[in-house]
Amino acid sequence: MSASRTNVNVAIVGTGNIGGELLNQIKGFNENASTNGTTSFNVVAISSMEGHYVSKDYQPINLSEWKNLTSQNQGAYSLDALVDFLAKSPLPAILVDNTASEAIAQSYPKFLSKKINIATPNKKAFSASNDVYQNIIKASKESGALLMHEASVGAGLPIISTLKELIATGDEIIKIEGIFSGTLSYIFNVWSPNGKKGTASFSDIVKIAKQNGYTEPDPRDDLNGMDVARKVTILSRIAGVHVESASSFPVKSLIPEPLKSAVNAEEFLAGLPNFDSEFASMREEAEKEGKVVRFVGEADVANKTTLVKLEKYDASHPFANLQSSDNIISFTTKRYHTRPLVVIGAGAGAAVTAAGVLGDMIKIMSQVRASDAPSA
């Protein structure tokens, strides 16, 4: 593959479900680019906890062989070495962070200050303490390096881009609310179904969700509400609401207090049936009102407040009519006031998340090409 001035060098950090899928999608993108004679991505470094491979002289790595190549060098490539490597790139560079690492997220200013662009689904950078967040944003603004994280909320759904476009076009954001967790979407859609009486116990549905791969290995990591809190923090900050951290506002936890100290997931799941009656009474109260129960995040931009809560919704409400593990986000604005703008779809999964990251990479590449284009 020949490298033109408008190609972009890419370093991939994290090769798990999302990272591995992204490498496959980049390979397909490059094959189409080669056929069409358009710009492609030169993947020049791949790093994970298992191993790494860094290309000599920035030559594109053969993406059909990346697993074999990274197995030659144990452990992750040093972040400082990666900053230095990308800073010396003869072509514009993108760091793609597919991890959930706080350490990598806190290193973003090092990359950005060297004019290394970043595309990532990592929520930690944008929901960390306000000081960490502001340092990242400041580094991007001062260097001009692009920073995109569409997939940090809603996987491949156009949530962040929609919010930014509403703001850029002069709309006034009043409220953002939604069902941000695919796991909790599934649990509540089954436990509190629309149009019929819920019969399954909360504990049984959590167990089924875990068996089907919807939850984290320890379901408490979903039920504590912090994943939703991080996503609401990200959107709140973009909308101009000061949020000190994802733990600085009210977050409803679905973990019964006595089970917070359970030593492992098995002990937690064994004890959860003891609290089914408490959850059932909540559901029965909603059903008497002709409503369903949903777990939602809310950024009340007009009043500068943020929270994560359980809420009851009428059967006709969009939040009451989701399928499976779908996400749904509603934007109430000055323009979209009577009927809020709604984004709905699959908000989890390696394929859609990787596609969201690739979409950001394509946007970065397009902007880099535009800045490199000769003036008329």
Swiss-Prot record:
Cofactor(s) required, per the database record: a metal cation
Known pathway: Amino-acid biosynthesis; L-methionine biosynthesis via de novo pathway; L-homoserine from L-aspartate: step 3/3; Amino-acid biosynthesis; L-threonine biosynthesis; L-threonine from L-aspartate: step 3/5
GO BP: aspartate family amino acid biosynthetic process; homoserine biosynthetic process; methionine biosynthetic process; threonine biosynthetic process
Phosphoserine modification, residue list: S201
A molecular function (GO) term: NADP binding
Protein residues bound to L-homoserine: E216, D227
Chemical reaction(s) catalysed: L-homoserine + NADP(+) = L-aspartate 4-semialdehyde + NADPH + H(+); L-homoserine + NAD(+) = L-aspartate 4-semialdehyde + NADH + H(+)
Catalytic site positions: K231 (proton donor)
Residues that coordinate or bind NADP(+): N17, I18, T99, K123, G213, E216, G349
Alphabetically ordered keywords of this record: Amino-acid biosynthesis, Metal-binding, Methionine biosynthesis, NAD, NADP, Oxidoreductase, Phosphoprotein, Sodium, Threonine biosynthesis
EC number: 1.1.1.3
Residues spanning the membrane: none
UniProt binding sites for Na(+): E150, V153, A155, L157
Function: Catalyzes the conversion of L-aspartate-beta-semialdehyde (L-Asa) to L-homoserine (L-Hse), the third step in the biosynthesis of amino acids that derive from aspartate (the aspartate family of amino acids), including methioinine and threonine, the latter of which is a precursor to isoleucine; production of homoserine leads to a branch-point in the pathway as it can either be O-phosphorylated for processing to threonine, or O-acylated for processing to methionine.
Family stated for the protein in its record: Belongs to the homoserine dehydrogenase family.
Annotated protein name in UniProt: Homoserine dehydrogenase
Lineage: Eukaryota, Fungi, Dikarya, Ascomycota, Taphrinomycotina
